[in-house]
């Protein structure tokens, strides 16, 4: 929070209120009279200053009473009766007065002078001006002076125990800070009222947990007239590249448009089988598979400075993904397919099919269009290689279109179904794709990748590109690519867990699920349909109404 501009040369002083009956006041030698003396001292010691009182959040919410009423205050005193970030407020102050409030220590961390009228844990170490009658005795008991770092380490790291917000296990302060920082950042990105437009019941059910807006409503349609009457701070959420006209009109009005898509480590099953996503990309600038404009991901890859710690995180994540065989859908048997004798001594090329009406194929593969064309282009360029074709899991499941024509099947030396992507990648020397995420997963495993379209990972010097990408001029290492694409870009959530988690949390959850499923049989068609019906029924109950 930012206070009104101060008069040049006029200092600002903060007096921190607390709630009546607070145990820290009782144990810290403070009373209601303490707060009267505190405000009097602030006024007397700073006759030319602005005096501000910070009201406690429990007082603002009506749950507790404080020690200051507006009508009792001197005309020089201003009551700050609204929520604010303590550190942002303290940064604007020149002196801070407290009884026993923790804000006194936070002021010390910012290098502010602090006067203590009570006996908080951070008093008596030579860092505060202590005016309590027992202050001298307290300092004698402390026995030595300490600096702010000493106090921070003792109180925040050595003394306090932490629980990981995601796993519920013992954790470090750094785990908790990472979680808090992530959730604060996402919360600040999307506080405006949000309309989810044109989404199915299931899609709304999966999307809403990934939005941080205080108010989320669903609309079947949003007419130009209604769009023109929406407040300027409204956010529009769209799935993928649908409703292009609405997206253009909303952005022309200056509204925020969030285009949402599956993340790159999605789930333990297919989206078309109604497995809820564990990650989604929420992009205010476009979609990562459409090269016509620079998505937030492309901008991050182009400009984000990746320091050695970031790259190290990318390397560790890459190694964990490969070691546990984690990919987008985590399907199929991990048994490595057998190559016939005819393949021995030949270069092994894995061609990855896609769902042919998928938006990434429509937008990002305008030169080679469709699985038949991809297989033909690969065979034409590699007549002597052993070519293996693997279709998309959604196509294999019968949920989406993209089967090869019989005339194209003869171009492949081997067609593999059932086996997991990771198992197939073990065999390959090269992987050829249009825009498939499988190309990215092949890069993680050290494979040579040929791209005939414009996936997010092409154009950075890591792939052989058959599609022009002149906007992407930066050269990246694989670990830099992994850090930006997996650690920074998507949002992650786990079932039944509050808040947004890290990609590492999701990978660990998937690895545990995968180990638990070892030896389990595949679901029958009937079981899949029953589970899908259950997911859909819950979606209707939770999100079944348009406004």
Predicted regions and their residues:
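Short acidic-hydrophobic, aromatic-tinged amphipathic segments that line or gate anion-handling sites
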Residues: 77-83, 135, 218-222, 413-418, ...
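Catalytic donor nucleotide-activated moiety binding site of glycosyltransferases and closely related
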Residues: 39-81, 375-417
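A donor-sugar binding/catalytic signature common to diverse glycosyltransferases
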Residues: 83-128, 238-248, 256, 261, ...
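N-terminal pre-catalytic "stem/leader" segment of glycosyltransferase-like enzymes
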Residues: 21-22, 173-233, 240-247, 357-358
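Leloir-type glycosyltransferase catalytic cores
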Residues: 1-9, 26, 128-198, 202, ...
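Short loop/turn segments at strand-loop or loop-helix junctions that form parts
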Residues: 10-22, 55-56, 119, 261-262, ...
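Segments forming glycine/polar-rich beta-alpha architectures that bind adenosine-containing cofactors
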Residues: 1-3, 7, 30-31, 208-275, ...
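Histidine-anchored nucleotide/phosphate-binding helix
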Residues: 15, 28-45, 208-211, 245, ...
């Amino acid at each position: 929070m930012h206070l009104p501009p101060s008069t040049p040369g006029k200092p600002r002083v903060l007096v921190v209120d607390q709630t009546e009956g607070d145990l820290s006041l009782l144990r810290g030698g403070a009373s209601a009279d303490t707060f009267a003396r505190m405000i009097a001292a602030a006024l007397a010691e700073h006759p030319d200053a602005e005096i501000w009182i910070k009201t406690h959040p429990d007082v603002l919410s009506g749950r507790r009473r404080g020690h200051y009423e507006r009508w009792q205050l001197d005309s020089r005193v201003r009551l700050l009766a609204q929520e604010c970030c303590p550190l942002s407020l303290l940064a604007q102050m020149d002196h801070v007065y407290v009884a026993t409030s923790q804000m006194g220590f936070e002021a010390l961390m910012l290098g502010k002078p602090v006067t203590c009228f009570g006996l908080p844990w951070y008093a008596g170490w030579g860092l505060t001006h202590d005016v309590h009658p027992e202050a001298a005795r307290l300092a004698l008991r402390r026995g030595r002076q300490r600096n702010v770092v000493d106090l921070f380490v003792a109180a925040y790291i050595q003394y306090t125990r932490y629980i990981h917000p995601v796993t519920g296990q013992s954790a470090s302060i750094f785990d908790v800070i990472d979680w808090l920082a992530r959730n604060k950042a996402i919360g600040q990105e999307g506080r405006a009222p949000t309309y989810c437009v044109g989404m199915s019941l299931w899609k709304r059910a999966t999307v809403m947990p990934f939005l941080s807006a205080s108010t989320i409503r669903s609309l079947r349609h949003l007419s130009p007239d209604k769009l023109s009457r929406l407040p300027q701070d409204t956010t529009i959420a769209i799935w993928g590249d649908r409703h292009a006209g609405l997206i253009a009109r909303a952005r022309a009005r200056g509204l925020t448009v969030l285009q949402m898509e599956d993340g790159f480590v999605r789930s333990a099953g297919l989206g078309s089988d109604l497995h809820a996503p564990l990650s989604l990309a929420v992009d205010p600038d476009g979609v990562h598979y459409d090269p016509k404009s620079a998505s937030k991901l492309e901008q991050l890859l182009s400009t984000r400075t990746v320091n050695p710690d970031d790259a190290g995180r990318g390397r560790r994540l890459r190694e964990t993904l490969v070691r546990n065989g984690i990919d987008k859908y985590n399907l199929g048997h991990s048994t490595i397919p057998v190559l016939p004798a005819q393949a021995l001594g030949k270069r092994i090329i894995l061609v990855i099919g896609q769902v042919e009406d998928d938006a990434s194929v429509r937008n990002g593969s305008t030169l080679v269009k469709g699985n038949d064309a991809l297989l033909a282009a690969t065979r034409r360029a590699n007549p002597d290689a052993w070519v293996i074709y693997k279709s998309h899991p959604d196509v294999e499941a019968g949920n989406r279109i993209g089967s090869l024509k019989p005339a194209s099947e003869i171009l492949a030396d081997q067609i593999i179904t059932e086996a997991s992507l990771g198992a197939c990648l073990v065999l390959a020397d090269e992987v050829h794709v249009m825009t498939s995420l499988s190309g990215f997963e092949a890069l993680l495993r050290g494979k040579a990748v040929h791209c005939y379209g414009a996936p997010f990972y092409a154009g950075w010097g890591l792939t052989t590109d058959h599609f022009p990408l002149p906007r992407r001029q930066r050269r990246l290492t694989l670990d830099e690519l992994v850090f930006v694409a997996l650690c920074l870009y998507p949002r992650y959530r786990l079932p039944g867990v509050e808040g947004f988690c890290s990609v590492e949390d999701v990978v660990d959850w998937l690895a545990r699920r995968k180990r638990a499923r070892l030896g389990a049989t595949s679901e029958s068609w009937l079981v899949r349909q029953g589970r899908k019906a259950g997911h859909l029924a819950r979606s209707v109950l939770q999100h079944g109404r348009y406004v």
